């Protein structure tokens, strides 16, 4: 366990700042225990620095559950530091000493429950309204700061001497709203607090419910169901209707206020701010109503304490002589007079720890502590200035006369115009008046009984404490499981997001690599085409040079042959003069040379035209080849994008299935845990109820045994009583006999006295015999009647107890059945909500996939359209340039024999598919004839003087010149079969099977 969580550890600076470093034993003196509870004890003390009276609550954080106790102390100190309001207890500081926290607070007179205890009757409606108004103001302050008190009751509503109402005991409070802890005092708990772990969270409206119960408590001296077992009261509150005021004497405003506070459904219950506008608290009432009530209570406390004091003095002096007794009586009267002036003090705090003390002395002792999250309820000791005689359990401390005069000068009724907001001057005066003494509205017997009940009710209190501890542990286990599953879910979600991000990054890298590869391929193709064009030109030029040389050789041979023929013709004709022959021969030579020169010029011109035409054709074929390559590369890129998108969508669907499976598994785990905790809770509740039943039966049997044991004494007492009555009767008869005898003796002659005496004696004997018979009959009848009455009374008590316990057990079973049904309904609701969330998430995912696929298809179509349009523009621009240069489009579109000529070295690289195979055609199925898109291709024009060539057998309709012909492009752009053929396959398998040369059909 971390050191910061260990009980008493101050290593955490934030925790260390909560406590003062001084030694509290040196700062506070005259400590006297004035209250006790399960948390520890409350003491009256005086601050040596200011001589001010304070209340100190000592809370130990050692022993069992030390860590929980320490956390509760820290929480309460933090809460007290945060609140500053006239209607909340003033916090003065906290000190640590020997594993005990000293919580120092202002000192108040007592609680509203003390008023009920002292007066033994309900409060008046105007008094209840004043107390409720002050409590509501404090609650409105807490609720406005998202805090919940969670233990509102009369014992936690304190009063000061100026009549100010203050909320106390924040040990159960929550600094966050909403909350879901099972805390508070059973009889005052709201239904949503009892069902907190089963049905969810609650907010500050639980304090409004508790305030309504407190109003009934002030109006009827005890809260509803107080005569019921505390555990049974919980079950009753959770499933039965809200309580109401029983008496008809209360006003409609009060009834409506209580009914509003006790609305079973929290949403129908008003807030504390809304209740401050209710007519019940806004009605006009005397400003001194609480001051007068406090003064009457103090007077009553003084009378009760003086009565106890006189009883004690009577016991002390009952054996003394008359003289000392008279002196003691006189002294008692003088002291009574002094007490009447100065008053008494029995300072104790509110009795939050033992609710039975906040009711009456005769109320049952089965009430339990109000516990906070980890320990029992703490009572904030209330106490301030006031009366001047301090009573401990066995002594009375009198004050000096000058203190009495100072008390009279500082009478709060002469300086407190507003009981809710006393001025600072009165506070300053009360501070000095409060230096030497403190006042109270509680009797000494109440303090003593509080301590005794705390010791006697330990078993019941421990049972409730254990039950609340179990509920907190169950809630902690459930929260721990939920946090664990939430962390697992977050980790799983992060892992899935990371996998998806990794895949997307890999896809982006692959696509970037592919684009770079395509760019390199285009650059390489451009270089190859430039080299091919250069080689093509060189090849044609070489052929033309060879043809020219051959032509020149042929001309030389022809010239030589013609020259020889001419010479032979001249030689045959001997008649022609030699000179003429020479001239004719020269002229013929010149003609031959001129003709040959013209033929040579014509050949050179034809060769130049052929070279220009073939180069232009070659460039067009290169352009078409580049377009085909671009189409192949774009097709490969789009197919790659399609494959990646399909793989990404497949991963998203797998992740959705994985998240769905994990969510259902987590929900099942939480629901199983909740069912198990409910089972354990119900088992504990049943065990506690059975133990309570056994304890009640055991107590009743013990009571009956004591009655049986006490019966002989009772019978003896009855017999003595009858005997005394008989003796009295005998004495009366004896006196009557004597009076009658004297009368007869006086009225009868003396001679008859003997007979008269004998007759009277016989009559007396007969009457005494009858009286003796009556005495025996009375004794026997009394014995039989008493035994029968005892048996009948005990049997009736047993029957009543059995019926009561059976009703409580049935109430528990009904409560547990309701909890199980609510849990099942909650589980079904959670399952339906999860299914709806999963279905919605799946629908959104599928919609997203569909939108992405549609966007990808649109992008694909747009890319293809823009590519074809650009290529069509390039072809059109090229053809326009060709027309300007004097080339016919028909001639350029028809393939020359050299289109597939491989006769020159290295001429094969430009005409093959750069991607490794014949790519598919854009706009027609694979294997389909391109004749559907272009005109039949005829062989190229025969070269001059070369009717046959190596490219004479070129197949008609070759795709080289068709795929990007203007006619095909125009058909594609105008929406021919190409658009239907561009529909892509959505299957990853079809793409992979077709590879990068996938058909767009």
Curated annotation (Swiss-Prot):
The modification Phosphothreonine is found at residue 669. InterPro entries: Kinase-like_dom_sf (IPR011009), Prot_kinase_dom (IPR000719), Protein_kinase_ATP_BS (IPR017441), Ser/Thr_kinase_AS (IPR008271), TAO_STE20_kinase (IPR051234). Residues 577-587 have a biased composition (Basic and acidic residues). ATP binds at residues 34-42, 57. CDD domains: STKc_TAO1. GO terms for biological process: central nervous system neuron development; DNA damage response; DNA repair; execution phase of apoptosis; microtubule cytoskeleton organization; mitotic G2 DNA damage checkpoint signaling; negative regulation of microtubule depolymerization; neuron cellular homeostasis. Residues 324-380, 404-433, 567-587, 905-1001 are annotated as: Disordered. It catalyses: L-seryl-[protein] + ATP = O-phospho-L-seryl-[protein] + ADP + H(+); L-threonyl-[protein] + ATP = O-phospho-L-threonyl-[protein] + ADP + H(+). Residues 458-651, 754-877 form a coiled coil. Serine/threonine-protein kinase activity is inhibited by SPRED1. It is found in: Cytoplasm. The active site is at residue 151. The keyword Kinase applies. Keywords: Apoptosis, ATP-binding, Coiled coil, Cytoplasm, DNA damage, DNA repair, Kinase, Nucleotide-binding, Phosphoprotein, Serine/threonine-protein kinase, Transferase. Its EC number is 2.7.11.1. Proteolytically processed by caspase-3 (CASP3). Autophosphorylated. Phosphorylated by ATM in response to DNA damage. Phosphorylated by LRRK2. One of its GO terms (cellular component) is plasma membrane. Residues 350-370, 921-930 have a biased composition (Low complexity). Serine/threonine-protein kinase involved in various processes such as p38/MAPK14 stress-activated MAPK cascade, DNA damage response and regulation of cytoskeleton stability. Phosphorylates MAP2K3, MAP2K6 and MARK2. Acts as an activator of the p38/MAPK14 stress-activated MAPK cascade by mediating phosphorylation and subsequent activation of the upstream MAP2K3 and MAP2K6 kinases. Involved in G-protein coupled receptor signaling to p38/MAPK14. Self-associates. Interacts with MAP2K3. Interacts with SPRED1. Interacts with TESK1; the interaction inhibits TAOK1 kinase activity. Interacts with MAP3K7. This is Serine/threonine-protein kinase TAO1. It comes from Mus musculus (Mouse).
């Amino acid at each position: 366990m971390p050191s910061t969580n260990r009980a008493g550890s101050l290593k955490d600076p934030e925790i260390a700042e909560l406590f003062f470093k001084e030694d509290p034993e040196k700062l506070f003196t005259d400590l006297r225990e004035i209250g006790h509870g399960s948390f520890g004890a409350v003491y009256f003390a005086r601050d040596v620095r200011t001589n001010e009276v304070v209340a100190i609550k000592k809370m130990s954080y050692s022993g069992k559950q030390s860590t929980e106790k320490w956390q509760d102390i820290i929480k309460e100190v933090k809460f007290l530091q945060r609140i500053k309001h006239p209607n909340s207890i003033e916090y003065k500081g906290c000190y640590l000493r020997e594993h005990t926290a000293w919580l120092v607070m202002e000192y108040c007179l007592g609680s509203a429950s003390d008023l009920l205890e002292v007066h033994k009757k309900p409060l008046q409606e105007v008094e209840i309204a004043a107390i409720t108004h002050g409590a509501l103001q404090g609650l409105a302050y807490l609720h406005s700061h998202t805090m919940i008190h969670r233990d509102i009751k009369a014992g936690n509503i304190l009063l000061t001497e100026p009549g100010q109402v203050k909320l106390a005991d924040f040990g159960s409070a929550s600094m966050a709203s909403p909350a879901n802890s099972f805390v508070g005092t059973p009889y005052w708990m709201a239904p949503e607090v009892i069902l907190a772990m089963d049905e969810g969270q609650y907010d500050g409206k639980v304090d409004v419910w508790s305030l309504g119960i407190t109003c009934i408590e002030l109006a009827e001296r005890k809260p509803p169901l107080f005569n019921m077992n505390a555990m049974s009261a919980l079950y009753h509150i959770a499933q039965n209707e809200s309580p109401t005021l029983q008496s008809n004497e209360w006003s409609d405003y009060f009834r409506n206020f209580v009914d509003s506070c006790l609305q079973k459904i929290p949403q129908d219950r008003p807030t504390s701010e809304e209740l401050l506008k209710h007519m019940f608290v806004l009605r006009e009432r005397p400003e001194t109503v609480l001051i007068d009530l406090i003064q009457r209570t103090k007077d009553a406390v003084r009378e009760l304490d003086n009565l106890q004091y006189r009883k004690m003095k009577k016991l002390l002096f009952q054996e003394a002589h008359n003289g000392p007794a008279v002196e003691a009586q006189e002294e008692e009267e003088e002291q009574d007079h002094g007490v009447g002036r100065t008053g008494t003090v029995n300072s104790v705090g509110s009795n939050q720890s033992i609710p039975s003390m906040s009711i009456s002395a005769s109320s049952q002792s089965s009430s339990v502590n109000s516990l906070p999250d980890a320990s029992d309820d703490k009572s904030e000791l209330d106490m301030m200035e006031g009366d001047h005689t301090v009573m401990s359990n066995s002594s009375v401390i009198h004050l000096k006369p000058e203190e009495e005069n100072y008390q009279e000068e500082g009478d709060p009724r002469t300086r407190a115009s507003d009981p809710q907001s006393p001025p600072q001057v009165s506070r300053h005066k009360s501070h000095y008046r409060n230096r030497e003494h403190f006042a109270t509205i509680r009797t000494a017997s109440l303090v003593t009984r509080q301590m005794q009940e705390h010791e006697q009710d330990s078993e019941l209190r421990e049972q409730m404490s254990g039950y609340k501890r179990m509920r907190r542990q169950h809630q902690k286990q459930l929260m721990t499981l939920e946090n664990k599953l939430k962390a697992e879910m977050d980790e799983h979600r992060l892992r899935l997001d990371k996998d998806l991000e990794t895949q997307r990054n890999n896809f982006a890298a692959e696509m970037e690599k592919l684009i770079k590869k395509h760019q390199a391929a285009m650059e390489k193709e451009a270089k190859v085409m430039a080299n091919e064009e250069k080689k093509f030109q060189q090849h044609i030029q070489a052929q033309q040079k060879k043809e020219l040389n051959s032509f020149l050789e042929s001309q030389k041979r022809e010239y030589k042959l013609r020259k020889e023929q001419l010479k032979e013709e001249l030689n045959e004709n001997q008649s022609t003069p030699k000179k003429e022959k020479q001239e004719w021969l020269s002229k013929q030579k010149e003609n031959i040379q001129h003709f040959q020169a013209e033929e040579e010029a014509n050949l050179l011109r034809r060769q130049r035209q052929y070279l220009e035409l073939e180069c232009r054709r070659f460039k067009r074929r290169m352009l078409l080849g580049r377009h085909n390559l671009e189409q192949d590369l774009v097709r490969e890129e789009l197919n790659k994008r399609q494959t990646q998108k399909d793989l990404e969508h497949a991963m998203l669907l797998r992740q959705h299935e994985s998240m769905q499976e994990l969510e259902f598994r987590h929900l099942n785990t939480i629901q199983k845990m909740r069912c198990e905790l409910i089972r354990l809770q119900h088992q504990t509740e049943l065990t506690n109820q059975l133990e309570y039943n056994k304890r009640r039966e055991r107590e009743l049997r013990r009571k009956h045994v004591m009655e049986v044991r006490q019966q002989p004494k009772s019978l003896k007492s009855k017999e003595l009583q009858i005997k005394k009555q008989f003796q009295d009767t005998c004495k009366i008869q004896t006196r009557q006999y004597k009076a009658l005898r004297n009368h007869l003796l006086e009225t009868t002659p003396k001679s008859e006295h003997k007979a008269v005496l004998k007759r009277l004696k016989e009559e007396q004997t007969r009457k005494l015999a009858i009286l003796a018979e009556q005495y025996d009959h009375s004794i026997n009848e009394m014995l039989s009647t008493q035994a029968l009455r005892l048996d009948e009374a005990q049997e009736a008590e047993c029957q009543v107890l059995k019926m009561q316990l059976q009703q409580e057990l049935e109430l528990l079973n009904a409560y547990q059945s309701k909890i199980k049904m609510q849990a099942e309904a909650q589980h079904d609701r959670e399952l339906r909500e999860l299914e709806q969330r999963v279905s919605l998430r799946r629908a959104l995912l599928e919609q997203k996939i569909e939108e992405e696929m549609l966007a990808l298809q649109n992008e694909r179509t747009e890319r293809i359209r823009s590519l074809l349009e650009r290529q069509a523009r390039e072809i059109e621009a090229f053809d326009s340039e060709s027309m300007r240069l004097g080339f016919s489009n028909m001639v350029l579109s028809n393939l020359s024999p050299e289109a597939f000529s491989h006769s020159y070295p290295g001429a094969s690289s430009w005409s093959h598919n750069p991607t490794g195979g014949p790519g598919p055609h854009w706009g027609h199925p694979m294997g389909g004839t391109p004749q559907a898109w272009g005109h039949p291709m005829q062989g190229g024009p025969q070269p001059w003087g070369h009717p046959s060539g190596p490219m004479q057998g070129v197949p008609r309709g070759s795709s080289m010149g068709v795929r990007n012909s203007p006619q095909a492009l125009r058909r594609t752009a105008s929406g021919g079969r190409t658009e239907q053929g561009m529909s892509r396959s959505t299957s990853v398998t079809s793409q992979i099977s077709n590879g990068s040369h996938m058909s767009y059909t």
